[in-house]
Amino acid sequence: MALDFIEILKVIFLGIVEGITEWLPISSTGHMLLVDEFITLNMSEAFKEMFFVVIQLGAILAVVVMFWNKMFPFQFKNKSQSIIKKDTFSLWFKVAVACVPSAIMGILFDDYLDAHLHTPVVIAIMLILYGVLFIVIENRNKKRTATTSTLADISYKTALMIGVFQVLSLIPGTSRSGATIIGALLIGVSRVAAAEFTFFLAVPTMLGASAFKLLKFGFDFTSAELLTLVIGMAVAFAVSVFVIKFLMSYIKKHDFKVFGWYRIVLGILVLLITAI
């Protein structure tokens, strides 16, 4: 089965939604599921469940490309000599520690979450709840100075605590970046360091989630399914590059409250539409 023009447009739109919402703390999975309620892909439910996760690989690639110098643990002086960047290695060990809680909980409860919590009402409630949290936390932080200003300042204990907050993002509508940023802000991490650690944490977390979904689905793709994945990931990559640049520039001068208000408004709209 070949993709028709309308289906290609749907995939492009979903890629745009993924690229925008993956890095802003507004829940990419929640937005993808909501969009699917109105613009449904003509694919099996099993494929769509996998697609909504694996499309994140495009967004991951954008982070790797943009933060390569910070992420790559080696620095080459010349063709035959390289220097190990100890701070980068240390940071990756901290990221690994932060990944453990969500990896365990994701494997244990993936089927339950997919079966019971992927609903518009759950998404709406989580959008509103975490929107309120963003506003409350940012108002509280006006009178406080961050105790952890840079990535290098993040301790193993802080990394683990951020990882525990990431578990909350398994509930659709929460937002992986939203949960980790809220957790980081609560324990005294600066906005910029919180966002950067979230980007680092996204790489193994989303690679692991994508691999898990691919293994569950199997690798027996039709040509249409494979094309859907490629288009979705390519669009998500391109859009993510611009969104990451915007977010890092934005949070240097502004707080996250605007995203909190957006979440609240969207959550209320979803509840109203669902009730009609």
Swiss-Prot record:
**Which keywords fit this entry according to its UniProt record?**
Antibiotic resistance, Cell membrane, Cell shape, Cell wall biogenesis/degradation, Hydrolase, Membrane, Peptidoglycan synthesis, Plasmid, Transmembrane, Transmembrane helix
Task: Write down the membrane topology.
Answer: Multi-pass membrane protein
Give a Gene Ontology cellular component term annotated to this protein.
plasma membrane
Q: Which residues cross the membrane?
A: 6-26, 49-69, 89-109, 117-137, 151-171, 181-201, 224-244, 256-276
- One Gene Ontology term of the molecular function aspect: undecaprenyl-diphosphatase activity
Kindly report, in one word, the top-level EC class recorded for this enzyme.
Answer: hydrolase
Induction field? Transcription is activated by the regulatory protein BcrR in the presence of bacitracin.
Catalytic reactions of this protein? di-trans,octa-cis-undecaprenyl diphosphate + H2O = di-trans,octa-cis-undecaprenyl phosphate + phosphate + H(+)
Pfam families in the record: BacA
Q: What's the Enzyme Commission number for this chain?
A: 3.6.1.27
List the HAMAP family. Undec_diphosphatase
Print the miscellaneous field. Bacitracin is thought to be involved in the inhibition of peptidoglycan synthesis by sequestering undecaprenyl diphosphate, thereby reducing the pool of lipid carrier available.
Q: What does this protein do?
A: Catalyzes the dephosphorylation of undecaprenyl diphosphate (UPP). Confers resistance to bacitracin.
Q: Which family does it belong to?
A: Belongs to the UppP family.
Q: What is this protein called?
A: Undecaprenyl-diphosphatase
What gene name does this entry carry?
Answer: uppP
